[in-house]
């Protein structure tokens, strides 16, 4: 920024208006005007004050004409010093305003970039979540599918429970059969024990019989031996008797017949005894053989019954073990199915909870984004309002600075006027001052125009030096030409306004002593005209 208030953010026409001229603040011009335009006066109070001073100067150009001759050089020097100090203050204030405005513009650019980024993110989110009802329908469809799956799992569980009840009934029947088989096994074991006991008794009886057979065989052998000995002894006796009979026969012939009779009797008796012994032995052996055969059949039947009982017991035991294994497998399968169903139900419930949480988080995120977007819109609107206010303020400053020199000189020379009841630095609040300020001479207008011309020439010289250091491009040359044209148009407009002011001053001198209400109306009309002219200039700048 140069010493003449040059700022790269502003156009040349705006820079021409920001010259180092003093600023005169008027706290209150007229009560009616301040109440009617309070909103605008909060941003453009210096503008209205300068315009009031300017009108005061233009209206009082005739009445103060004689008083100028009475001014001495000391007062003029003091006024010039005051004007210099005011210009210095104005320069500092303008630099501060330019810096603030530049910072505001940077802040606005930064916020616009952030707004663009957020709008892009919002657009992406809207595209991503363009149909929240579709997600809701998808979630609801998935929830319905999961509920149907849960119902199917419940139905399957009920079917498995029915099957489990049937298996439990089968198990109870098998357990009843098992108990019956256990009882029959115990009965068979009891009968087997009795059969074993009978077999043992039969074996003992057989052993006794075998012992008795052995003893009888020994007795038969002994009897045979005794019989043979007896036969031998009898034969010996017979031979001895025969010899003796022969001897007697020789002596007594009748003894041989007697010996034959005795031998025949003994032979008959021995044959009879042998036959009786053989018959008794045979009958006894037959009885023992029959009893042994009977006992053997009973033992064999008992053994067969025991083996059959063992086979049945083993088969029932295997069947019971198979039923137990099947029961355990079914219970294990049922437990696995229950665990699987519980796990599936818990997983489905977790999925439902997760989807509900995601839906809630998505809704909250959408609400947060909408709130942030609303906040950004509010901030953007506030910034737009603030920018519009600053634009209005800058337009008012542009309008005010075009007439600041006239107002400053008027406020400086107002110290020597007896019409004013107070200093120009105390606020210039009285209406009598405004009425007397209209009598200032017209040649101060030319002096102000000369100062503005000098300032513009200085700015153009500064721009020419900068252009030498940095050659302008085609676009910048076109912009400079446009700015020159705008400056010429503004100068023509200012000349027209000066001519209008002179004509208005002439009319005001003729009208002379009108009241404050007419002045207020005229000032409002002038302000409206200047506002329309400023808006036209702003529109031209924008174009």
Swiss-Prot record:
The modification Phosphothreonine is found at residue 520. It comes from Mus musculus. Glycans are attached at residues 21, 27. PROSITE patterns: IF_ROD_1, IF_ROD_2. This is Neurofilament light polypeptide. Residues 472-528 have a biased composition (Acidic residues). InterPro entries: IF_conserved, IF_rod_dom, Intermed_filament_DNA-bd, Intermediate_filament. Residues 235-253 are annotated as: Linker 12. Forms homodimers (in vitro). Forms heterodimers with NEFH or NEFM; which can further hetero-oligomerize (in vitro). Forms heterodimers with INA (in vitro). Interacts with ARHGEF28. Interacts with TRIM2. The gene is Nefl.
